[in-house]
Design a protein with these regions (language model features):
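A Zn2+-metalloprotease active-site environment signal
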Residues: 1-267
C-alpha cells in the first residue's frame, strides 16, 4: 500500500513539475503569437471595413466628418492617444449603433448621430468605442468567440462568408460584462480629461434602457451593450467620486445642428 501511495505522490509531483515548467515558457514569444495577431489585425480591419462600407455607404460630407473628427481629435489629444491610429468611418445606416473593428477602425452609424440627444451623448459612445480599441478588446473578443485560425483564414483567402461571419459578431455580439465596464469607466476618464461632461453618457444609457430613443426599433447598440440601466448607475456613481469641473460644450451649437440636419435627411 505504501508503495502505491509513494508512486502516486511521485506522479503528482512529476505532473506539477512539468506544469510549472510549461507555465514558465514564453509561448507567445516562442510561437510569435503577438506578431501574428498584429499582422492579422491589420488585414482584418481593412477587410471588415470594406464589408461594412459595401452594406452602408460612407458619409463624406463636411457637415458630418468635421464635427466627428473634432470630437475624436479632442479626446485623443487630451488622453495622449495617437489620433492616426483611430480610423473613423461614418456610415449611412439608420441603426443606432457604433462599434470598433480591428486595427483601430471605428464605425459610427448615422442613426446614432440622429438619435443622440446632444454632442456630449454622442461623445460618450465614441469614447466607449475608443476604449475598446485602446484596451485591445476587439481582437481579444474575436479570438475568444471564433478562434485565431478563423481570423487568419479570413485574411488569407478564406472567403467572404468568413468575413461576413466575423462582421456579424462585431456588430451584433456584446463584449463580456467585464470588458464593457472597463470600457465605460475608461470612456468617462477620456471625457473628463477632454473637459467633456460625462453625465450625458449616463443619460444616453438610461434613455436607451427605457426604449425612449427617437427610433427604438433600430436600437442595435443596446442589444450589443446590455444592462444599460445598471451601467448608467455605476457611471454616475463613478462620476460622483470625481472632482467637478467646469465643462465646455464639445461642439459649437451650429455644428451640431448642421450635422443633425444632414443625417435627418438620410434616415
Amino acid at each position: 500500500m505504501r508503495k502505491i501511495i509513494l508512486q502516486g505522490m511521485v506522479m503528482v509531483l512529476a505532473f506539477l513539475g512539468i506544469w510549472f515548467a510549461l507555465e514558465r515558457i514564453d509561448w507567445e514569444g516562442l510561437l510569435k503569437v503577438n506578431q501574428l495577431t498584429e499582422q492579422t489585425e491589420e488585414k482584418l480591419g481593412e477587410l471588415l471595413n470594406d464589408v461594412f462600407i459595401k452594406e452602408s455607404p460612407e458619409i463624406y460630407s463636411r457637415d458630418v466628418v468635421e464635427p466627428i473628427d473634432s470630437i475624436v481629435s479632442k479626446v485623443c489629444r487630451a488622453n495622449s492617444i495617437d489620433r492616426s491610429k483611430i480610423k473613423v468611418h461614418v456610415l449611412e445606416n439608420s441603426e443606432v449603433n457604433a462599434f470598433a473593428l480591428p486595427a483601430g477602425h471605428l464605425v459610427i452609424y448615422s442613426g446614432l448621430i440622429y438619435d443622440a440627444g446632444s454632442a456630449e451623448e454622442l461623445s460618450g459612445v465614441i469614447c466607449h468605442e475608443i476604449a475598446h480599441i485602446t484596451e485591445k478588446h476587439v481582437m481579444k473578443s474575436l479570438v475568444k468567440e471564433l478562434g485565431l485560425s478563423v481570423l487568419i483564414s479570413a485574411t488569407t483567402g478564406g472567403g467572404s462568408d468568413v468575413a461576413g461571419r466575423i462582421a456579424n459578431v462585431l456588430s451584433s455580439t456584446a463584449f463580456d460584462r467585464k470588458l464593457e465596464k472597463a470600457a465605460d469607466i475608461k470612456a468617462v476618464g477620456y471625457l473628463m480629461a477632454a473637459n467633456i461632461n460625462p453625465e450625458p453618457f449616463a443619460d444616453f444609457m438610461y434613455r436607451i434602457s427605457d426604449g425612449e430613443g427617437s427610433v427604438p426599433e433600430y436600437l442595435s447598440w443596446v442589444s450589443t451593450h446590455p444592462d444599460s440601466r445598471e451601467r448608467a448607475e455605476y457611471i454616475i456613481d463613478y462620476i460622483k467620486g470625481k472632482e467637478k469641473k467646469d465643462y465646455k460644450p464639445v461642439l459649437p451649437a451650429a455644428a451640431w445642428t448642421k450635422m443633425k440636419n444632414y443625417v435627418k435627411r438620410k434616415i
